[in-house]
A protein has these predicted regions:
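Catalytic helix-loop patch of NAD(P)-dependent Rossmann-fold dehydrogenases
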Residues: 96-100, 104, 140-187, 208
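Small/polar-residue-rich segments within soluble enzyme cores
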Residues: 1-24, 29
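Glycine/proline-rich active-site loop of Rossmann-fold NAD(P)-dependent oxidoreductases
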Residues: 163, 176-177, 188-198, 231-243, ...
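Conserved Rossmann-fold NAD(P)-dependent oxidoreductase catalytic core, especially the SDR/UDP-sugar
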Residues: 111-157, 180
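A conserved pocket-lining segment of Rossmann-fold NAD(P)-dependent short-chain dehydrogenase/reductase
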Residues: 201-219, 223, 227-230, 239, ...
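Mid/C-terminal beta-alpha module of Rossmann-like enzyme folds, strongest
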Residues: 227-230, 234-290, 315-326
């Protein structure tokens, strides 16, 4: 456990959601960016995307797998973008040593990198937090829409390890050292890990799938990369901001499965007859119920949280995102 959240008010835990007003993307402003987390899926995809679409961003990356990064000179960079972390946690029956590993990587490392960036004169630090700081998905049949008044309340050590860093790096912000915290929902794209590949496997195998009217926020990797490029080229007035990028539309699990099947040339029938089985599965304690609620539960951000005047990043809709992911 770490104690950066101790004594914080609800407002401090939530943070300053969004910019303080309209912003303007200045594509002529050259920025030097250092990614801390070389070889990561998000870091490498972003680096390639920015290289293709935003030549004003000059990007390097440093490996965080050993301590050699501590000798790196951060002083020539305008922005440090910290992506190193452990995700996709199986939080059941985990020993204390494993939990400590999550805190060392997700909390301690992030804070250490942020302090180094500030000490060496970097102007801006961008931290990848996660929607997981708001807890688990609501179970099947229950709604969950996070808005700007929702207080982060992690359900497990993984979420807490992210929130501790989320709060700690914002505490380091001042007028000369801006901190941007991103709390994205599930990120997916070609080569991604996590829940999406598991869902895609089912879509390619199953002839039928339950018709569940759930609501989930998701973020395609190209939309994230576009968002990152644009926010790196804007100025904002508050020392720290919390940003919530997501796709323009919420996703239903059944709709996503149908689209994956269609892109892969396979017809998946979406039928309501299986819904009672899903309901029963959601009531089973332990891993089965957890998996059912993870797939068919509700976890969405209010769309208004993800609209920023001057930023136009939601370029890829659901159908196109699946085509790019499966193509």
């Amino acid at each position: 456990m770490r104690n950066y959240t101790d004594g914080k008010s609800a407002e401090q835990l939530i943070g300053h959601i969004g910019f303080c007003g309209p912003v303007e993307v200045d594509t002529s402003s050259v920025k030097k960016v250092l990614i801390t987390g070389a070889g990561s899926y998000i870091g490498e995809t972003f680096r390639a995307y920015a290289g293709k679409h935003y030549p004003a961003l000059h990007i390097d990356a440093v490996d965080m797998l050993d301590r050699s990064w501590k000798k790196a000179d951060f002083s020539s960079y305008d922005i440090v973008y910290h992506v190193a972390g452990i995700a996709h946690a199986d939080v059941g029956n985990v020993d204390d040593a494993t939990k400590e590993k999550y805190y060392k990587v997700n909390t301690d490392l992030a804070v250490e990198v942020c302090k180094k960036a500030k000490a060496e004169g970097v102007k801006e630090f961008i931290f990848m937090s996660s929607m997981i700081v708001y807890g688990d998905s609501a179970p099947y049949g229950k709604k969950k829409v996070v808005d700007e008044h929702t207080v982060p309340q992690p359900a497990n050590f993984y979420g807490d390890s992210k929130l501790q860093a989320d709060v700690a790096v914002r505490d380091l912000a001042d007028d000369k050292f801006k901190v941007v915290v991103l709390r994205p929902p599930m990120i997916y794209g070609k080569g991604s890990k996590g829940n999406y590949p598991s869902l895609a496997k089912l879509a390619k195998k199953l002839p039928i799938f339950p018709k569940i009217e759930n609501e989930r926020s998701m973020l395609h990797i190209d939309n994230l990369c576009e968002f990152l490029c644009q926010i790196m080229l804007v100025e904002f007035c508050t020392p720290s901001v919390v940003l919530i990028p997501q796709n323009a539309e919420w996703t239903k699990t059944s709709e996503m499965v149908r689209e994956i099947g269609e892109v892969c040339g396979k017809r998946v029938r979406i039928v309501g007859i299986l819904n009672p089985a899903v309901w029963l599965g959601s009531k089973v304690p332990g891993k089965i119920g957890g998996l059912v609620n993870k797939a068919f539960g509700n976890s969405a951000y209010a769309q208004s949280m993800s609209v920023y005047e001057g930023i136009d990043y939601q370029k890829v809709d659901l159908k196109e995102s699946i085509r790019r992911t499966e193509g």
